[in-house]
Amino acid sequence: MDEKEMTMREALNLALDQALRADDRVFLLGEDIADPGASGPTAGLSTKYGHDRVLDTPISEAAIVGAAVGAAIDGLLPVAEIMIMDFIGIAADQLINNAAKLRFMTAGRTTAPITVRTQVYGGLATGATHSQTLEAWFMHIPGMKVIVPSTPRDGKGLLTSAIFDEVRACSSRRFACRAKRALCQRIPASRFRLGRPISSGQAPTSR
């Protein structure tokens, strides 16, 4: 199997690239994600796939996630980006009361399988409103999966799994990554998933 050494950002970029190429239903939306943008994991993708599939949005987290929920209900596979995790609370109603609960409120007849990707900047001197790790909030919400990869391999495989997750019981997924870390790892260049449904990857465990 062909392998390449990649950083987390490069691994996420490749996962998004391969997902966009594999399925026309996949599209990305978020603030400043189109070229030239501020998001390393989406670099080059709007140039390659066009602005219909890599959408720059206004600065409104509620609108980003709300649009993703509507698109998912219509059969698309949206990957929404919240640029900084601290602001994910602005989209809490769309995440919790719409995406996560829709399956239960419709007895399984309707789901909104979205992927929400965000970043953590804690420890990088980014200030009190750009450095929180809020993953635990959403672990208490039925219908959501929370993924925090620790390696580039986990990042690529778990993001792919989240986008194409076949288990619609968890209709809303968040994908949180510490993309600033400089860890490099040799990972498969081809598209792969980690678990069906999503597994725990290869995160180190301490007791």
Q: Across the structure, where does each feature detected by a protein language model lie?
A:
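Glycine-/acidic-rich phosphate or pyrophosphate-binding loops and their flanking alpha/beta elements
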Residues: A11-Q18, K156-V167, A179-R207
